[in-house]
Amino acid sequence: NFGKVIEPLAETFRVACVSYDGFDETEQTQFPTMIEETAKIEEYIKEHYDGKICAAYGCSLGGSFVGLMAARGVIHMDYGILGGSDLDQSAKLPAKLMTALMLPMIYPFLTTGRFRLPFLNRKLEKWRKAGDGYVDAFIGMMRGAGVDLSFITKESLRNQFYSDLITPLADAINPAGTEIHILYALKMGEKYRARYHRHFAHPVLHELDMQHEELLAVHPKEWVELIEDICRQK
């Protein structure tokens, strides 16, 4: 996800990248639950950084982890930065139905780069041709450049998708000494503004006239500059 920005970030910060259980080709693991995975991240930060870091950034699912760490208060971060995460939540039954519907579509695409249903591949190709490079850049960020993801199991993807939906994120999260910043892609829709303000007491919204994670996927240099600007505020 962050291949284009790690080196420039490392010029200013000590960078640690999180790989989730079940999504790292160097391990034979399955993704457990959001809470278990959050606890593992927190334990690593406690062991290697005395429980204190300058900033944590997460996009999509990663933003849920940043929110959970901010709410739990096990570790301290000066800045919690979310990259336009949707923070969707659901009761267990609807979450099971949604997972059952989405898994047959997402899993083949994630592991092979192709949907099982031909009309979805045609639709994707149409988006690619009509777009300005965002679709290809986003897919490249999600799947990696030429990376073989066939090691990811359906169980890991199922656990990740379902657990993210049913794991509650508190409202009015306001950890002492932590600023919450959100890279808010306006093209995602106005409902997310209200969602961010519900879950976080004082979020700083960086409004971008872009689509979900477009800044990171298409404009990595500008993304790095924004992250550096955020982390210079204290």
Regions found by a protein language model. Give the residues of each.
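Conserved serine/cysteine hydrolase catalytic core
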Residues: 152-198
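Gly/Ala-rich beta-loop-alpha elbow adjacent to hydrolase catalytic centers
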Residues: 58-66
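The serine-hydrolase catalytic nucleophile loop
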Residues: 1-6
